[in-house]
Amino acid sequence: MRDLHAKKQRVPHNRVKKPPKERKPINWGPILKFASRGFGGAALCAGLGFGGWQLYNLVSRTTLLRLEAIEVSPLKRVSREEIITLAGVRPGDSMLKVDLKTVVARLSKNPWLEEVQVRRYFPHTLSITVSERAPQAVANVGCLYYLDDKGVLFKSLVEGDRLDYPLITGFTEEELAQDPKGCQEALKNALALIDTLKNGGVFSLEDISEIHYSKGYGFTLFTMQGGVPVKLGNGGFGEKLTRLAGIYKELQPQMQALDYIDLDYADKIIVKKV
């Protein structure tokens, strides 16, 4: 007989019981050390911030940094008292609590002031430097406005404002809103025309009562004597006015009988009688 013997069955590895691993205790030391550093840093920052704020409040309440001197640059149209009142500062104010941007914003509301600079000089001085606008003409745009040398309408006229400036007409508030750049360019051209007239000899700014602008045509002058239209168009003002100056003395006795003078030609002048 065959000798039969039972084979040993292999036990799967996943069924082999292994001795449990020994767990290592968590080392809390480095973790607590790191956390304590973080909390300590945060507490330090908070303490410094709070301390700085308390120091700021303390210094701002003391008399050590109080405003004593307010320096204002010399002005022609706006008084020193008006500047200080508009700035909203006064001696005794805390130097630290004076907000320079706020002071600049307040002063910029005055239309006469073109540029404003405010500086703080510790311990006791505030310096206000401003430049004023200078009117070059009066423009009628539905109401009267002063025009500065940059072609900017900066102030509406009120009772008591001077009117002895060249008068510019032909612009409307609607046109200014719809085409601000185009209107400003035309106003600059009007200023160039005024400068040309100021330098005139026989025919000058004193001979003009009004400078009228038409978007489709250009410029037309109206004479002081008789209100005669002098058509200029656009550009070449110096050459055109020089030609008129050559015959203006002859025309002066006839001004009441003239309908218009047309200079908008390259080589001639048209004088039309009524």
Swiss-Prot record:
Entry's transmembrane regions: 34-56
Positions in the Periplasmic compartment: 57-274
Highest taxon of the lineage: Bacteria
Biased composition (Basic residues): 7-21
GO biological process: cell septum assembly; FtsZ-dependent cytokinesis
Bilayer topology term: Single-pass type II membrane protein
Region (Disordered): 1-24
First and last residue of the signal peptide: none
Cytoplasmic side: 1-33
Alphabetical UniProt keywords: Cell cycle, Cell division, Cell inner membrane, Cell membrane, Membrane, Transmembrane, Transmembrane helix
Compartments in which it is found: Cell inner membrane
GO cellular component: cell division site; plasma membrane
Keyword Transmembrane helix: yes
Pfam families in the record: FtsQ_DivIB_C, POTRA_1
The keyword Cell cycle is assigned to this record: yes
Domain spans labelled POTRA: 65-133
Family: Belongs to the FtsQ/DivIB family. FtsQ subfamily.
PANTHER family: CELL DIVISION PROTEIN FTSQ
Its biological purpose: Essential cell division protein.
Protein name from the UniProt record: Cell division protein FtsQ
Organism per entry: Geobacter sp. (strain M21)
